């Protein structure tokens, strides 16, 4: 049996050089859990109609600045209204810049390495091995009617799992086990519509993230035949006919876009003038310097080759042609915002917003052509890790409404925040904090695992530290000499182009951030469930 306390003591004694090793060892415990969920979750309360309704709105790959309140060029009137009536956490980050680990972190309130789910290729945890109740199950036990529409992306598995607390569960496509546990699939209920969508996107490449997927088009497929359109329409039908008047509602509406491919209904494309769209700024260098992203290119040839394809295509485009991608990305955000508005209107008509918490977030960001025409995520720079986190609704204290909170915040904070509002037991081991309470994160944490050894981020409003090992995982010894780093002063260098890590002038702040990162890892994994050997 692994002696975790000994590991933590050793890490503190040996300094930050061991922080990466600590987290890797912690990840190995991701499938060792207590025999009884009650050991860490405690008792949950029963339902009651006086509890606030919880409306959880989510997208995929939406940058922190892809909402109108942070970017006047983008049109998201419904999210902007929620921000004016709530609180926007503008320094929030995800816990991993890819779908599966980020979404599991959200649903369990735990870091990806605590769960052992660190990449999109990670296998989903089987139901008997869950560390605690996922968020929908926690709320179901607390007396909520639970309805989930759209993407969860638990991960791949060969074994069937349940709906994990969702009494109603609808998704747009089965997609090789990524959406397990649903009760309604577009594949089964609208195969012709899904086939039409797949025909339109057939040349978009894996994950719809090839060159054609990012160039995008004005879609000729009817809205409902899109996977997000199908999910939205099923959600709106449920809000008309499926609400239980005797129970509070937990509604989860989660879209696949604005993730590429960027095939968007024409009326939303027409909302934008390409002359108003900014061109993406590029760094003063052509080759990625000695960064965790450069090392990722060396070890992951799929990502490196895809970047070469994007670079070859976008470097030959005119300015207006490059802007077209950003326009389609913005239009995607506007389309989803419109669906959110329709859902909120039905909830308001049903009286469900008189006592409600409304949450909006995304799983990670999008590079959108930055750093020499890179797209998707898969790195620890702000365009990839910063996300919109927005709390609105009647339960938000009046003094917070219309405010922007610039304290560090994390995606895992949403689990304890929602649990507190719902009157159920907070997950005691969660690294997250109640965002509506007096939360006091020193910084925000994100981890990135790819083909090589991992990289870890510690971020404050002003500074960002990234530590990584430029060796394949099976070759890394995790000595201090092998650890490399990046340090950025975000206020003067928001694009993160000037690495200050080796600059002696910034040695003091570099070491302070290292200490804070190590403290966060030590405290997090010392509180992790260890199970029986």
Residue ranges and their predicted role:
Residues 2-479, 484, 494-515, 519, ...:
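Formylglycine-dependent sulfatase
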Residues 487-488:
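Short hydrophobic beta-strand that contains or immediately precedes a catalytic carboxylate
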Residues 491:
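Residues forming the ATP-binding cleft of Hanks-type serine/threonine protein kinase domains
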